[in-house]
From Swiss-Prot:
Pfam family, one: Memo
Superkingdom field: Archaea
Family label: Belongs to the MEMO1 family.
Source organism phylogeny: Archaea, Methanobacteriati, Methanobacteriota, Thermococci, Thermococcales
Name the record gives this protein: MEMO1 family protein PF1638
SUPFAM superfamilies reported for this sequence: LigB-like
Native species: Pyrococcus furiosus (strain ATCC 43587 / DSM 3638 / JCM 8422 / Vc1)
């Protein structure tokens, strides 16, 4: 089973420009490490011109720490298709950079242990939040010469219960099968503006990005504290429009079980830096979680 790229040429280039763009993002890339301290990362999933550099910071850190065998990638289900919690079962995902294999055994075991997920490919058919992560992984895997695999999971339900159930299942499955993994939570942060129907504050155009950042930082601080409950409390209190909190919650739960003790915000920006539009402003953050 091959899942074909559906947003190549839209969210990211579908030709040789993709490699050139990735090279530009990674001009400061260091040597591949072997520490393997990073347990999870947060990366945005907007068009590369808006959030590609921010996403690259997460993958740069992972590469310099050492690539894992498997990336378990969680993204929000924007389409509403398929199972509410859908683990892609088997086969390969294709992008302009080639194909990357799904770890079928790990996918199945996570699904079984979670008791809330289904093996389902329909939810992934048109979803972009996981696909846009793959060129970063493929580019670095090619540099490394490693045969990296993935387990894609879309979330149509995102709450504390899902975070704990899936985070625990991913940890137990990876331990049981002896897999070295990193969890990637694919999410954008605040979606502000009339375009999104979310205008909790108004200000001059030059002030808006800072206000968006302030509100995002209320959530990000909770993430950096590994505080799942606090993160959802902040989101609910502000009616915050972050689109992938469930995946971040899973990353926190998994990381704590895996022994992570620190989290770092590597980069933050908003779409305003590129678009200069206040009709729609989206926040983007790069975060990693690490063991001692």
């Amino acid at each position: 089973m091959i899942r074909r790229a559906v947003v190549a040429g839209q969210f990211y280039p579908d030709d040789a420009e993709l490699v050139e763009m990735l090279k530009r993002f990674f001009t400061d890339l260091g040597e591949e490490g072997n520490s393997r301290r990073i347990t999870a990362g947060v990366a945005p999933h907007a068009g590369y011109i808006f959030s590609g550099y921010t996403a690259s910071r997460t993958y740069k850190a992972i590469y310099e720490d050492g690539l894992p065998e498997v990336f378990v990638i969680l993204g929000p289900n924007h389409t509403g298709l398929g199972s509410p919690i859908a683990v892609y079962p088997k086969g390969e995902w294709e992008t302009p950079l080639g194909r990357i294999k799904v770890d079928e055994k790990l996918a199945r075991r996570i699904t079984e242990l979670s008791e809330i997920a289904d093996l389902d490919d329909l939810a992934h058919k048109y979803e972009h939040s996981i696909e846009v992560q793959l060129p970063f992984i493929q580019y670095l895997a090619e540099l490394s010469g490693k045969d990296v695999k993935i387990v894609p999971i879309t979330l149509g339900i995102q709450d504390e219960e899902v975070s704990y159930a899936l985070g625990k299942a991913i940890y137990e499955a990876s331990q049981e099968l002896g897999r070295d993994i990193v969890v990637i939570a694919s999410t954008d942060f605040m979606h502000y503006g009339e375009f999104y129907g979310y205008v909790p504050f108004r200000a001059r155009a030059d002030e808006l990005p800072n206000l968006v950042k302030e509100w995002d930082m209320r959530v990000i601080r909770r993430i950096l504290d590994f505080d799942v409950e606090g993160m959802f409390e902040e989101i609910n209190a502000m009616n915050h429009t972050m689109c992938g909190p469930g995946g971040v919650g899973v990353g926190i739960v998994y990381s704590k079980l895996a022994g992570a003790i620190e989290a770092e915000l590597l980069h933050y920006t908003t779409s305003f830096e590129v678009s200069r539009s206040t009709d729609a402003i989206v926040g983007y953050a790069s975060i990693v979680m690490r063991k001692a």
